[in-house]
Amino acid sequence: MTGHIVPGGEGRLLVRLVREQVLGLPLLRGEVPGSGFTARRVRRTARALRRHGVTRVLAPEDFPFWGEAAAQGLRPVETGELCRALAAPIALAALEADGVPPRLAAVALRGDRVTRSLREAALELCPVVRQLLVEVPAGGEALRQTLRREFGLPAVEGGPGRPAHLTLCFSPPGGMERGRIADLSGDWPALPEYRFGLAEGALPEDAAALPLLSALWQAGRLTAESIAVTAHFRT
């Protein structure tokens, strides 16, 4: 069961639990006493949600009390699997933000092995970028051969001597990445320079966008193709 922690409003003294649906996703909404978050109020709300079977929760953007929620047995909704499924849109958003046309771009894919998400990213990117650098020790050569047969020359073995505009990391970075780095590894990738939303329509504002999209995607309520990605770099 997934929960949703939100402020409850002025004058409320008790935790209030309400079943709700957000874009077809059933949630147990935990309304924190009062109009704002405090550590004590969040602990009370998290404890109540956990007693009702909740193990992971959504919360507003920049929610400051994950430690208090974790102490009661709650964790954020995992976003890593969705981020890896969105690797190609993330790459194209990064190139667009940097003003680099995909047909002129070299993009590196790095990982310990060829996973389904890495393979799908390669198949999506290879036809549209100038060069795709596949830097994967386990299964990388077989993937490069598949891409060469289907698309021709763009897929090659990467390495320190080959420049890249962007490196997509499907496993933790090892210090050999070039250009911009999008670390998609782990359960909760940190992608503060990217924005995620619906290609059509709007998300509710009382839950952080990426975890909500991930919960919807995991539940089969939307597809990766219905998610829009943009990038906003400071430098």
Question: How does the language model describe each region?
Answer:
Residues 1-8, 55-59, 104-113, 132-136, ...:
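Short hydrophobic beta-strand segments
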Residues 5-66:
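Metallocofactor- and cofactor-centric catalytic cores in central/energy metabolism, strongly enriched
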Residues 10-12, 17-23, 31, 179-235:
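Adenosine-phosphate binding glycine-rich loop
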Residues 20-25, 48-56, 68-78, 124-136, ...:
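Structural alpha-beta junctions
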Residues 33-37, 63-66, 112-117, 139-140, ...:
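Short acidic, S/G/P-rich loop/turn micro-motifs used as interaction or catalytic elements
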Residues 151-201:
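Rossmann-like adenosine-cofactor binding region
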